[in-house]
Amino acid sequence: MAGLKVRKGDTVQVIAGKDRGTKGKVIAAFPREQKLLVEGVNRVRRHTKVTATTRGSKTGGIITKEAPIHVSNVMVVCPECEKPTRLGRRQDVVDASTGKTRPVRICKRCGKEI
């Protein structure tokens, strides 16, 4: 199974599901499950039991937090053209004398490095 093309810190737009059209920043990526945690997307309510903390305060109640969303339901938003795009890969030369290269992600729409 290949790794994810989307990384933590990328801005993505949801293309399918109840939050379709919403843009958000990737908080965490789970490559093994092919899922992402996106800020402000797929918010769910969790009922947590009231428990005492070490300082004596009590925590619990209804908490709203983000749930993971499948990577196929999002597209990366290019920072240059501000539109959802597919990603490509290109080898950029780091050192011409030694021929060292590094892979970079590029926007298929405008061709700029992401």
Swiss-Prot record:
Q: Determine if Ribonucleoprotein is one of this entry's keywords.
A: yes
| BP GO terms, sorted | translation
Q: What is the name of this protein? A: Large ribosomal subunit protein uL24
Keyword vocabulary terms for this entry:
Ribonucleoprotein, Ribosomal protein, RNA-binding, rRNA-binding
Would you identify the family this protein belongs to, as annotated?
Belongs to the universal ribosomal protein uL24 family.
Give a yes or no for keyword RNA-binding in this entry. yes
The entry lists its GO molecular-function terms as: rRNA binding; structural constituent of ribosome
According to the lineage, what is the superkingdom?
Bacteria
Q: Entry's PANTHER family?
A: MITOCHONDRIAL RIBOSOMAL PROTEIN L24
Its GO CC terms?
A: ribonucleoprotein complex; ribosome
Instruction: Show which residues constitute the signal peptide.
Output: none
| Subunit architecture | Part of the 50S ribosomal subunit.
HAMAP family assigned to the protein according to its UniProt record, in alphabetical order: Ribosomal_uL24_B
